[in-house]
Amino acid sequence: MNAILLDARGGAVEKQTVTPRRVRLTRAAVDRLAELTGVPSPFASVPAPVGGAAGDLVGRLGDNVPAPAVPVADLDEALVAASLVADGVPTEEGRAVLAVWHAPALAVELEVLVRLRRGTVRVRSWHRNLDDWVVCLSTGDGLAFELTWLAAEDWWLELGRAAHVDLATLRESEYAAPLPAVVETPWELLLATGEAVRRHRTELFDVMVADHSGTTLAGDSPRMLETAADADVRLWHEQLESDSRGRLHAAVMGRDRRGRPGAGIVEWVLLGDGWRSLTPVTRDGWTMVRIERRSVVDLPRELAVRAAEVTS
């Protein structure tokens, strides 16, 4: 069943064929579009796609720095330039964008934090999908936003774009060699060694690794893993924390065929040579984490798997 959004006059808003666009708007301009359309702003507290707690976008934008007041005429001019408003009323495209936003069948929320040579950058992006439409809202500061709408078949390109990082902008790694393509290690060991690095207690590493001796595997693929030497395990765990240049967190939310809400999570860590995924696995009664080399094209694939799990 397709969701129907009503405008201020009670008329149904029809979703038209998608013409991909990417525009930059202030938060005030997005609020103005919602006001003209007669629907809540995307930044208002609205029910989350999976039910449960309210999805207050404003509360998840970080530091709320007050934006300077902008005349309504200037906001309307920006919306006209973006083809979202014409003759003082929202265009069909403008109405369709908000229709998809407020009634998604599937939602993805992304947060990427990267420590560059020039400082730390954090970008947040919210994606909403309904039928053939995808609407994305992204920001780096909570004031200026990039609003994108595109066809669902091109969604994977937008998701991959969110994970793109120019490695030349990162600080150089202090380690001579990168991690193996795949490392499978006990979850509790990863947590303990990470805490030891943060507290500058690396002298505890030898004991921690010895307590889990023989449990860490490494190799070129998940099907070609061999037991790693304790010395290598110690180095890799220290490297994972010390060489970290950022992280990526993604959540996929939707409902299964019975209407029950669900969510799937993707976690990546950025090292000097690129992304690594962190995936929980179970082996011989141990709770393990598989640390696997990733590229930007792998993100939409992982999210597609999570989406299939959520909606099946």
What positions do the PLM features span?
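Short, amphipathic alpha-helical interface elements at domain boundaries
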Residues: 2-80, 84-87, 95-96, 103
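Low-complexity, intrinsically disordered/propeptide-like segments
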Residues: 8-9, 207, 251, 306
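Generic structural signal of hydrophobic/aromatic residues within well-ordered alpha-helices
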Residues: 33, 75, 94-98, 159, ...
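Charged, compositionally biased non-catalytic regions
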Residues: 61-95, 174-230, 307-312
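Accessory beta->alpha helical hairpin/"wing" motif in late/C-terminal subdomains of nucleic-acid enzymes
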Residues: 72-73, 77, 82-162, 286
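Extended, Lys/Arg-enriched charged tracts that mediate electrostatic binding to polyanionic substrates
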Residues: 92-132, 220-265
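Mixed-charge, glycine-accented linear interaction segment located at domain edges/termini
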Residues: 134-200, 204-206, 216-217, 277-312
